[in-house]
Design a protein with these regions (language model features):
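A short, charged, amphipathic alpha-helix used as a generic interaction element across diverse proteins
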Residues: 2-23
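Short N-terminal "domain-start" leader segments
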Residues: 18-47
Length: 47
């Protein structure tokens, strides 16, 4: 799934961390941001 802004990607990543008990990497793609994508690394969410 592609998120248009970083804030939306962070919220989704935090939700995924809780549900799956894992770390989530956010990457930049042509149309916004992806979780576990193959683009440029932006940040890792651990919460």
């Amino acid at each position: 799934m592609i998120y248009e802004d970083l804030d939306a990607a962070i919220v989704a990543a935090k939700d995924m961390c809780v549900v799956l008990e894992t770390y989530v990497k956010i990457t930049k793609c042509a149309k916004g941001y992806e979780l576990f994508g193959t683009g440029e690394f932006v940040m890792e969410i651990k919460e």
